[in-house]
Amino acid sequence: MNMLNYQVVGITDYEPAVEFALYTRQLLFPEIYHGQIPKDLQNFEQFYVHDPLGCFITVKDQNRIIGTIAYRVYDHRFDLNLPSNTVEVVKLFVLPEYRRKGIATQLCNMLFSHAKNSAITTLYLHTHPFLPAAEEFWTLQGFEVIQREWIDTYDTIHMSKSL
């Protein structure tokens, strides 16, 4: 494996990140994909570039994106009693052939550092039991389960981490 390049995505280089995020969404959630582009990806600059409570990180092997992670302002759509300046961790994905090499942990560490430097104190995420090892991974990153519930078609695990 070559040297990997981790970087925060900016205004000039976000289109490949959006394409990768759409590709991974289709892989993970084919039953809800239906070609619909989520609001944060339609308005990438607004959510991840211009908003001080937004960040999108890619990791590349040569010029190919092989993984991503991001956070954006949390919209409080779940009744979880989280602080008002909470951000939601989203879009963690590493291509299967690059997994089990510490890349996801490295992406998380970079994201946590960026969040601390932006004076963010609470991170929120949700995951699902059908994603192999997701809950265990996030627990190893310092997240704690705050609630489990059934939403629409998925069991959902809500987790948070204080920085």
Regions found by a protein language model. Give the residues of each.
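Conserved GNAT acetyl-CoA-binding A-motif
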Residues: C108, A115-H126
